[in-house]
UniProtKB/Swiss-Prot annotation:
Gene name of the record: COPB1
N-acetylthreonine carried by residues: T2
Membrane association type: Peripheral membrane protein
Matches recorded under Gene3D superfamilies: Leucine-rich Repeat Variant
Key words of the record: Acetylation, Cell membrane, Cytoplasm, Cytoplasmic vesicle, ER-Golgi transport, Golgi apparatus, Membrane, Protein transport, Repeat, Transport
Taxonomic classification: Eukaryota, Metazoa, Chordata, Craniata, Vertebrata
Gene Ontology BP, a term: intracellular protein transport
Stored SUPFAM superfamilies: ARM repeat
Name by which UniProt lists this protein: Coatomer subunit beta
């Protein structure tokens, strides 16, 4: 049921081409037909009555000829018939014929078959006529003592409904049900009886619970759930009762039912904020996550733990449970692991960080032993990032983490290796005492690195942080080892020439028998000459990168060689050794330049790389103090500034998060004492059971914006003109995965409009759930029609259609009014999200759909334009505020958002202020949007185009 509907309707479709049966033929079938004919006739009568027909002449026929039958199908249909048939005269008096029906009910309540008794009792719950129910009360009471539980539990429901609607018919119902509950053994019967007492006489329910509070654990789970609900409601309304029932909730945490444990833990948290209660509830949640196999359940319960953590008073308690929380990592689902690691990272403290790191190190090693899988690679990335964060927050742990992680620099998964490299770069800059260890480990794994991107980063780290003579010499040795024989061009040509000297091997292919056109056999053999080639894997890594045409790594190598050569010159006093080392570095650069300009590589060297290597050669040949400072001091300072800015940004975001969580109390705020609080003030807290029920029904209330333009009236769309015969307008109600159109249809003519039908169709990833039913509109009458549309993805959808109708008494064809299109706003499905720079770049490279939007706005300030775009698109700016502060005439920023369907949307804003056009010139530039699906990219682009210009107020 959607949020816009409060009533459940029964819709029975009748084929349009079928001819409606006449009352005479139905009467004949009901009187003289066999059981099968009577069954079909009764079905037709029910459908006709549901569609508005009265059929008063058939009532007595059904009472005389159908009601006495004992066929079970007939009896089921009769229950539906008696529910829908009009039972009163126009002035509200009960029809005389219903007295006969009442007697039939009484006989069914005394029927030996328990199903007929039970279904009759269920039917009586739906009756709204006290005169019909009054004669049946003794029979209903007697059903409480029936041997079968199906009859007894439906008898309880019937008594509860009758007591609620007509209390005078059974005034002693609470007492009767209480006595029944005390002696009842069946779980479902006890549950129904207890539920009735909760709503009809809560004091009796509490009295019963008090007498059996120690046996609650032995009850069935359905009864335990009701007991949890009762305790919550009682303590919510009257907090002084908490001490009386909290022990019962503690006991229910040990229930065998996961549902009971979950509800009991949630109730315990609301009843008590004592550390023991929070710990017990959290422990219960953790056990549920580990034992439940459904990943959706795991995620829901994890969210409860995260909510607990958000409360400052509970965070300290949860910190002691970090190791228990880490047991959840045994779950193979990546999303569960991701949430678990984030929760553990938020809760880790100096008391348990060592244990956390040990567990995470074991998990990292485990990922190396299992078969490679996409989720394994991503999980390894998550572990690396978590260890990275732990090491930054707790520097003492870095020494334990680094040796394990650096093994993964040689990993085939570039993303995980890149995360390790980022961690190593930050660790070597922050922790001076670990530099020797990191350099040593880096030299150990250097030759095994497979990815050119990781190789480039490792080169930079070695060039920047090798400070001793031995380390510098080791780097040069590793570079020579990775480069192979030099000069590269000559050695490659010799290798080629050397492979051509032996006679070309002649290989004979397999002999095949072929059938010629004449039907005879012909023998064919294939002689082929081939030259054996050496596998590329035998090449040293750096040589392989260069021959593949990746000369960006050569530019990085040139910078590294320059740094270590300048540092070697400063460390070693002997001129001969200085010149020898510098010459060796220059020789390596020169041979790479020579290779780049030859025809051997798959791609030639770029001009940028040539310029970089040439610059490094010039620096080494001149050795000026200025260039020495730039290479050996200012490069490191740049990294230091970048890491400091990043750390400051993280601290700022954490501060904002903690400010959101911490409830600030003003000096003049009143203090609430429980003993002095009025009873009605205690109910100010929201009832969690009521909220969850509303959420399940789709009736969750969204907080309306303070802006009056954001009210519901802003979502009303006019569908027809005021001069059209039928006026229509629609309120578009957006839920998470569906849209409800509440269409107001007004007949503006003096004629009766028959078969007035709203015909809708959709464009985009929208699906109409059901066709709205036709209706009849009196002159100047109006009606509301609801249509439900399912949404499957985030893209601009269009709903269009028309209203068709017949004019009563007119012989003309059907009339049609075309409706205006309804455009569905994708902003209802997009939420701001965050990701790392590396993830952004990776997604940017992977996503194939790009939409380039040209900036066309009246906004004159760069920052104002960016904020306007963020507000219009619901995206989050990933570029730090410091990078956007100041004024330089241009701006570049990265934006990111996720849809509720899990789709990612990236945007890059590149804008400038044309200074030559004056201070009032509007912002110009482009916004590039990338997404996995074409619909997302186009929809977001359309949204930006529509909202670029700021409305003047």
């Amino acid at each position: 049921m959607t949020a816009a509907e409060n009533v459940c309707y029964t819709l029975i479709n009748v084929p349009m081409d079928s001819e409606p049966p006449s009352e005479i033929s139905l009467k004949n079938d009901l009187e003289k037909g066999d059981v099968k004919s009577k069954t079909e006739a009764l079905k037709k009568v029910i459908i006709m009555i549901l569609n508005g027909e009265k059929l008063p002449g058939l009532l007595m026929t059904i009472i005389r000829f159908v009601l006495p039958l004992q066929d079970h199908t007939i009896k089921k249909l009769l229950l539906v018939f008696w529910e829908i048939v009009p039972k009163t005269t126009p002035d509200g008096r009960l029809l005389h014929e219903m007295i006969l029906v009442c007697d039939a009910y009484r006989k069914d309540l005394q029927h030996p078959n328990e199903f007929i008794r039970g279904s009759t009792l269920r039917f009586l719950c739906k009756l709204k006529e006290a005169e019909l129910l009054e004669p049946l009360m003794p029979a209903i009471r007697a059903c409480l003592e029936h041997r079968h539980s199906y009859v007894r539990r439906n008898a309880v429901l019937a008594i509860y409904t009758i007591y609620r609607n007509f209390e005078h018919l059974i005034p002693d119902a609470p007492e009767l049900i209480h006595d029944f509950l005390v002696n009842e053994k069946d779980a479902s019967c006890k549950r129904n009886a207890f539920m009735m007492l909760i709503h009809a006489d809560q004091d009796r329910a509490l009295d019963y619970l008090s007498t059996c509070i120690d046996q609650v654990q032995t009850f069935g789970d359905i009864l335990q759930l009701v007991i949890v609900e009762l305790i919550y409601k009682v303590c919510h309304a009257n907090p002084s009762e908490r001490a009386r029932f909290i022990r019962c909730i503690y006991n229910l945490l040990q229930s065998s039912s996961p549902a009971v444990k979950y509800e009991a833990a949630g109730t315990l948290v609301t009843l008590s904020s004592a550390p023991t209660a929070i710990k017990a509830a959290a422990q219960c949640y953790i056990d549920l996550i580990i034992k439940e196999s459904d990943n959706n359940v795991k995620l829901i319960v994890l969210d409860r733990l995260i909510e607990l953590k958000e409360h400052p008073a509970h965070e300290r308690v949860l910190q002691d449970l970090v190791m228990d929380i880490l047991r959840v990592l045994s779950t193979p689902d990546l999303e569960v692991r991701k949430k678990t690691l984030q929760l553990a990272l938020d809760l880790v403290s100096s008391r348990n960080v060592e244990e956390l790191v040990i567990v995470l190190k074991k998990e990292v090693i485990k990922t190396n032993n299992v078969s490679e899988h996409e989720d394994t690679d991503k999980y390894r990335q998550l572990l690396v990032r978590t260890l990275h964060s732990c090491s930054v927050r707790f520097p003492d742990m870095a020494a334990n983490v680094i040796p394990v992680l650096m093994e993964f620099l040689s990993d085939s998964n570039e993303a995980a290796a890149a995360d390790v490299l980022e961690f190593v770069r930050e660790a070597i800059q922050r922790f001076d005492n670990l530099r020797m260890l990191i350099v040593e480990k880096m030299l150990e794994v250097f030759h095994a690195i497979k990815s050119v991107k990781i190789y480039r980063g490792a080169l930079w780290i070695l060039g920047e942080y090798c400070s001793t003579k031995d380390d510098i010499q080791s780097v040069m040795t590793e570079v020579r080892r990775s480069l192979g024989e030099i000069p590269i061009v000559e050695s490659e040509i010799k290798k080629e020439a050397g492979e051509l000297k032996p006679e070309e091997e002649i290989t004979v292919g397999p002999v095949q028998k072929l059938v010629t056109e004449m039907g005879t056999y012909a023998t064919q053999s294939a002689l082929s000459s081939s030259r054996p080639t050496k596998k590329e894997e035998e090449r040293p890594p750096l040589r392989g990168f260069l021959l593949d045409g990746d000369f960006f790594v050569a530019a990085s190598l040139a910078t590294t060689l320059t740094k270590i050569a300048l540092r070697y010159v400063a460390l070693v006093q002997e001129k001969k050794k200085q010149n020898s080392f510098v010459a060796e570095a220059m020789l390596l650069m020169a041979t790479i330049l020579h290779l780049g300009k030859s025809s051997l590589p798959k791609k030639p060297i770029t001009d940028d790389d040539v310029d970089r290597i040439s610059l490094c050669l010039k620096v080494l040949s001149e050795c000026s103090p200025l260039m020495n400072d730039i290479f050996n001091k200012e490069c490191r300072q740049s990294l230091s500034h970048m890491l400091s800015a990043k750390l400051e940004e993280e601290k700022l975001s954490q501060k904002k998060e903690s400010e959101k969580r911490n409830v600030t109390v003003q000096p003049d705020d009143p203090i609430s004492f429980m003993q002095l609080t009025a009873k009605n003030e205690m109910n100010c807290k929201e009832d969690q059971f009521q909220l969850s029920l509303l959420a399940a029904m789709g009736n969750t209330q969204r907080k309306e914006a303070a802006d009056p333009l954001a009210s519901k009236l802003n979502k009303v769309t006019q569908l027809t003109g005021f001069s059209d015969p039928v006026y229509a307008e629609a309120y578009v109600h957006v839920n998470q995965y569906d849209i409800v159109l509440d269409v107001l249809v007004v007949n503006q003519t003096s004629d009766t409009l028959q078969n007035c039908t709203l015909e809708l169709a959709t464009l985009g990833d929208l699906k109409l759930v059901e066709k709205p039913s036709p209706l009849t509109l009196a002159p100047h009458d109006f009606a509301n029609i609801k249509a439900n549309v399912k949404v499957a993805s985030t893209e601009n959808g269009i709903i269009f259609g028309n209203i068709v109708y017949d004019v009563s008494g007119a012989a003309s064809d059907r009339n049609c009014v075309v409706l205006s299109d309804i455009h569905i706003d994708i902003m209802d499905y997009i939420q701001p999200a965050t990701c790392t720079d590396a993830e952004f770049r990776q997604m940017w490279a992977e996503f194939e759909w790009e939409n380039k939007v040209t900036v066309n706005t009246n906004i004159v300030d760069l920052n104002d334009y960016l904020q306007h775009i963020l507000k219009s698109t619901n995206m989050k700016c990933l570029t730090p505020e410091k990078a956007l502060s100041g004024y330089c005439g241009f701006m570049a920023a990265n934006l990111y958002a996720r849809s509720i369907f899990g789709e990612d949307a990236l945007a890059n804003v590149s804008i400038e202020k044309p200074i030559q056009q004056g201070p009032e010139a509007p912002v110009t530039g482009h916004i590039r949007i990338r997404a996995k699906s074409q619909g997302m990219a186009l929809s977001l682009g359309d949204k930006i185009n529509l909202s670029q210009k700021k409305n003047s107020i």
